Amino acid sequence: QRSMMTAFYEARTTALTRQTDVKVIIYKGSDISRKLRQVGVIYKVKGEDGLDLGWVALNDGFRMPEGVFFVPSASNFSSFVKTSGQTSPSEIFKSTFNNGYTGAYEIVGVPEFPSRQPIAISDGNGDWFSYQFSSDGLSLNPGALVMLAMGHLDGDDYYVIDNPYNQLGFAIRRIGITIPFSDYSEMEETLR
């Protein structure tokens, strides 16, 4: 949880200091060593003429520890995650993007990460989930939830959540800061 919140902090700080758009990206592609675990920050670079050159990685990003992963939104949940035993998918808190008002894309195509050279990215399709900050450090996903869970990969490359109460997460405020939940019971009180 702390590493993920740090990525959002770095993204907001980069947006403010470089006065440019910034995205926190989470890998959702087929590489199982990275799926829902690799997190990065990319920012838009402009040339001297003010034209967009592309997006550059802030740093190498990080991978969450094995067994910890990003919980996709409800519309993507069943494509990546299963529950076991008596656990119902409705018991799992899913991430949200809250981008209806801002129009920020929740999925982007990043052909290479990390890239030190500016590269073009595609909006609306690709192998990465995305949360965005504007050049003034505001979240384009105001009120969105970023949820993490613990589980294991099964033979079909789905994450299986054994214990829904082993969840952590945080909310993103419009001003770009993150507010963590201390445990599952706090999430229940706040979100149900």
Protein language model annotation of sequence segments:
Residues 2-9, 13, 21, 26-192:
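N-terminal helix-rich module
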